[in-house]
Swiss-Prot record:
Top-level lineage group: Bacteria
Organism, as annotated: Bacillus subtilis (strain 168)
Protein name in UniProt: SPbeta prophage-derived uncharacterized protein YotE
């Protein structure tokens, strides 16, 4: 399983935010990114 770097996720969110200027959409992407990071951490914990 490829590890997802937090910086990569943040970069992705920033790029998406620039494309979609709606703050509502940005908030959705940020919460999605936070969820994604939490999921990755949880999965890492399960793998160990």
């Amino acid at each position: 399983m490829k590890e997802i770097e937090f910086e990569e996720v943040k970069k992705f969110v920033e790029v998406m935010s620039r494309r979609l200027r709606s703050t509502k959409v940005i908030k959705i992407h940020i919460s999605y990114a936070e969820w994604l990071v939490a999921e990755v951490e949880r999965l890492r914990g399960l793998v160990k």
